[in-house]
Amino acid sequence: MSIITGKTKLLGIIGHPVEHSLSPVMQNAEIKRLGVDYIYIPFPVKPENLETALDGFATIGVMGFNATIPHKQAIIPLLSEVTTTAKLVGAVNTVWRTEIGWKGTNTDVIGFVTPLKALNRDWNTIKPIILGNGGAARAVVVGLAELGCRDICVVGRDKDKLGQFKQSWDTSELQASITVHSWDELSGMVSESQLIVNTTPIGMFPHTQNSPVDSNLWEKLPNNAIAYDLIYNPSPTQFLKDAKQQGLTVIDGLDMLVYQGAAALEIWLQQPVSATVMSEALKQSLFS
């Protein structure tokens, strides 16, 4: 894409606010490399205008779009079709046009699991710990279940919200795989875990010195354990710095951001894309 014409196909992201989104940077970088006549645009859409926006997108021929806060749950009843993955997560982040209307899925799941698959572990034997019980934790639970994990521990600080999180899976096939635990239990659990995932915002810019766990926690984990932080700014976080200092394998939130975006672009374009190009564009935007 170099010049926008009457034939240029529209992609984008809806949110409120959406001005801070990094998706246009990485998506347009790969669109340019591929030489396809598309452009990816941020669309600020207030919650009360969501249905109107979808009608407008259909009218002007938008081919597909990402949905971010606060639309990832609210958009579901407005879609003609939703994938099983998105239903399990309870949120949609990627939407595309079909013959019967809009179809939605959640590429956060594939974004999360792709870096883990590259490690070639026996996931059936791994007992992961998830820090936090918000929306991001739901995608992580679904991803871990897809990998084959059958004993998924979710740790949170608010007892009521933890209970609600657990209850929200009661009608799901994953219900038996999930246990919830208070933060006080964490220290006694980590010696049996080979994967710890931070889904909380603790350590996010500008509070870069913070970590959701004490630095001495890492010495209790097995030597082959993996630390995964969904935060991508800073890169690495204090959480990952402490884990790496202990010699553990670390995965940055930038990987998840890139792979979920690449998965969405492949759905829209129906062709393979380069996650490397998207990653480099993001790093340049964030850190140069």
Curated annotation (Swiss-Prot):
Binding-site list for NADP(+): G132, N133, G134, G135, A136, L230, G253
GO MF terms, alphabetically ordered: NADP binding; shikimate 3-dehydrogenase (NADP+) activity
HAMAP family linked: Shikimate_DH_AroE (MF_00222)
First-tier enzyme category under EC: oxidoreductase
Gene Ontology cellular-component annotations: cytosol
Gene designation per UniProt: aroE
Reaction(s) the record says it catalyses: shikimate + NADP(+) = 3-dehydroshikimate + NADPH + H(+)
Organism (species): Crocosphaera subtropica (strain ATCC 51142 / BH68) (Cyanothece sp. (strain ATCC 51142))
Protein name from the UniProt record: Shikimate dehydrogenase (NADP(+))
